[in-house]
Amino acid sequence: MKGKLLKGVLSLGVGLGALYSGTSAQAEASTNQNDTLKVMTHNVYMLSTNLYPNWGQTERADLIGAADYIKNQDVVILNEVFDNSASDRLLGNLKKEYPNQTAVLGRSSGSEWDKTLGNYSSSTPEDGGVAIVSKWPIAEKIQYVFAKGCGPDNLSNKGFVYTKIKKNDRFVHVIGTHLQAEDSMCGKTSPASVRTNQLKEIQDFIKNKNIPNNEYVLIGGDMNVNKINAENNNDSEYASMFKTLNASVPSYTGHTATWDATTNSIAKYNFPDSPAEYLDYIIASKDHANPSYIENKVLQPKSPQWTVTSWFQKYTYNDYSDDYPVEATISMK
């Protein structure tokens, strides 16, 4: 959500058929599980409880960990796992289903990473809030912190997590990220220009990694790039995202937005009059193995009701997060 994290002191926080080189959007995904990869991305809205103590982070960590929607994936990318205690609890709750996990981006630069690259700083107030969990072994884990952000994003180690995952007899490379937020506090700096530079950093990393061109490379997360009303505009930021990453446009199914105040109780409380946005994606690099089909499906799972108290008033919600999860089905050749 544009500027959604500005409700307190700190903000931590593209069809274009010609760009899609896969088969028809109506193609059926392979029924061979070894040839199908299921990847989910979900921004779980776990802001620091030091700043936002009343968003049920600990309770939602348990609800998400037990939820059906997050099960039966190969890989899950988590965004906004900022709060240390709640994110540790969520990762612990997911351990049985997804025993192979990265640490949270930018929280430390220790031996939990094979490499730390980019502009990491241990003195930055907030981490990058991205982690990847996997059913399959993770052969390599790299964290990369972007060169710069704007506005309050400068106060976090935002960047991306790279994983090399071995599913049976093949390697798949999954990058999880959370790009610059749309933020009025960026001043004269355009958040869109910052996002473009961050996408270039991801693309440069992929090129320099020399990944074999017969292996799949997937990029996913909260891109903060809005698909709505942009799909048929070749000059839009949405179109530019795919061009910069040289990535295939997926088939889109499910709900028409990943953030929607008309259907989501948390989003409605925060920004009741804001238009819906489609910000979260999982896409495939065209410089590497090209999926025969890739679908992004927006799910709308409802959580059991949970209640918080603020200033002696109770507030009840029935969503896991203010963002909806996106489930990608990738048919590999």
Curated annotation (Swiss-Prot):
Q: Where is the protein situated, by its record's location annotation? A: Secreted
Where does the signal sequence lie? Answer: 1-27
If you read the UniProt record, what top EC class would you report for this enzyme, in one word?
hydrolase
Catalyzes what? a sphingomyelin + H2O = phosphocholine + an N-acylsphing-4-enine + H(+)
A GO MF term: sphingomyelin phosphodiesterase activity
Database matches in Gene3D superfamilies:
Endonuclease/exonuclease/phosphatase (3.60.10.10)
Identify its protein family.
Answer: Belongs to the neutral sphingomyelinase family.
Could you identify this protein by its name? Answer: Sphingomyelinase C
Organism the protein comes from: Bacillus cereus
What taxonomic lineage is listed for the species of origin?
Bacteria, Bacillati, Bacillota, Bacilli, Bacillales
